[in-house]
UniProtKB/Swiss-Prot annotation:
GO terms for molecular function: nucleotide binding; oxidoreductase activity, acting on NAD(P)H. Pathway: Antifungal biosynthesis. Its EC number is 1.-.-.-. Keywords: NADP, Nucleotide-binding, Oxidoreductase. It comes from the Eukaryota. Monomer. Pfam families: ADH_N. It is an enzyme of class 1 (oxidoreductase). It comes from Aspergillus nomiae NRRL (strain ATCC 15546 / NRRL 13137 / CBS 260.88 / M93). Trans-enoyl reductase; part of the gene cluster that mediates the biosynthesis of the tetrahydropyranyl antifungal agent restricticin that acts as an inhibitor of CYP51 and blocks the ergosterol biosynthesis. The highly reducing polyketide synthase rstn3, the short chain dehydrogenase rstn4, the cyclase rstn5, the FAD-dependent monooxygenase rstn6 and the enoylreductase rstn7 are required to generate the first stable intermediate desmethylrestrictinol. InterPro entries: ADH-like_N (IPR013154), GroES-like_sf (IPR011032), NAD(P)-bd_dom_sf (IPR036291), PKS_ER (IPR020843), Trans-enoyl_RdTase-like (IPR047122). The gene is rstn7. Belongs to the zinc-containing alcohol dehydrogenase family. The lineage of its organism: Eukaryota, Fungi, Dikarya, Ascomycota, Pezizomycotina. This is Trans-enoyl reductase rstn7.
């Protein structure tokens, strides 16, 4: 089959003779219909030294076979989507960029009838990151699956800063935070203010304005008469961490969460980094670095993805904007170069397989 794998240190290529993966306990064999690209994909390629490791994390497809240890929720022929662990140096068969892939059943969804393969392919990394960042790290209450969604901020709503509000994780985070009763404040490019407002951000701020934007945020929360205690950073670089730390209120109970190992420089702010790959509950590797399984993250992931299934079925979560790339799997490597060069913004790059 076609697949995008590591062929030498820091280099990946499309091959045409990759064997189908061997089905494991708790996994589905899926015939891939669409894949979406993430920055983590090209970053993994750059640090991978061993040949034969499959890349890609976001996919949608059709169940071909069901492995042992899986409940009756999934059937052969089901349309499914979710998160797979591409670039895993501990398990080279895992990944999305192939015609047939393995997907751990606990953290996959049945695609709702109203959603296309291309739309569903955008969910995996973002949904997992939102769950870990907002609900494990920052301890937001889970959204309810009944009742009306809040339309406008109320006096009871607490502000929540989301830096990178127009990223794939950010646009999901805004929606989930709103469903949990928070008032999302989005930091992004002005080009995407309309997008994040449509999804539920109560205010938008230009990251390029630096200290001026920080002051605008502080003025906004002052008018809310609510302190800003929580910040989620989907960009997770030194400047974004500094921005979030400056924007948080001067209180002892503030919390900053990031997607990469970086900390807020304020000593009075708790910093937490989440790594989406721990959701699989298995030992894993990133390049030459090894990480142990985290059973609590796997258990959280099962509960989280079950909730997400309900919210998607109810049409209460929108997927990110998509751009369809050319040439299917053959075009993915060129797409990753576009992503690495910051040529794709405010949308998710998706390829049909």
């Amino acid at each position: 089959m076609k697949a995008i794998i590591s062929v030498s240190p820091g280099r990946a290529a499309l091959v045409h003779d990759r064997p189908l993966p061997s089905l494991r306990n708790g996994y589905l064999l899926v015939r891939t219909k669409a894949v979406a690209l993430n920055p983590t994909d090209w970053k993994h390629i750059e640090i991978t030294e061993r040949p034969g490791i499959l890349f890609g994390c976001d996919y949608a497809g059709v169940v071909e076979k069901i492995g042992p240890g899986i409940s009756s929720r999934f059937q052969v022929g089901d349309r499914v989507a979710g998160f797979v662990h591409g670039g895993n140096s501990q398990e080279p068969q895992d990944g999305a960029f192939a015609e047939y892939i393995l997907a751990k059943a606990d953290i996959q969804i049945l695609i709702p009838e109203h959603m296309s393969f291309e739309e569903a392919a955008t969910l995996g990394v973002g949904v997992t990151s939102v769950g870990q960042g907002l609900y494990q790290a920052l301890q937001l209450p889970f959204p309810g699956t009944q009742g009306e969604d809040p339309k406008t901020p109320t006096e009871e709503q607490q502000p929540l800063l989301i830096y990178g509000g127009s990223t794939a994780s950010g646009v999901l985070g805004i929606q989930f935070a709103k469903l949990s009763g928070f008032a999302p404040l989005a930091v992004c490019s002005p080009d995407h203010f309309d997008l994040v407002e449509t999804l539920g951000a109560v205010a938008q701020f230009d990251y390029a304005d630096g200290e001026e934007a920080v002051q605008e945020i502080q003025d906004y929360v002052d008018r809310m008469s609510k302190p800003l205690r929580l910040a989620w950073d989907t960009v997770s670089i030194p400047s974004s961490a500094q921005f979030c730390g400056d924007a948080l209120s001067a209180l002892d109970e503030c919390h900053y969460a990031s997607l990469l190992p970086i900390k807020c420089q304020r000593s009075d702010v708790t910093s937490t980094t989440t790594m989406a790959y721990t959701v699989f509950g298995e030992d894993w590797g990133m390049g030459a670095t090894r990480f142990p399984a985290v059973a609590t993250d796997a258990e959280f992931g099962r509960r989280w993805w079950a909730l997400v299934q309900e919210l998607l079925d109810q049409g209460r979560i929108q997927t990110h904007r998509i751009i369809i790339g050319e040439n299917g799997l053959d075009g993915v490597l060129a797409g990753l170069e576009r992503l690495r060069d910051s040529q794709v913004r405010g949308a998710k790059l998706v390829y049909r397989v």
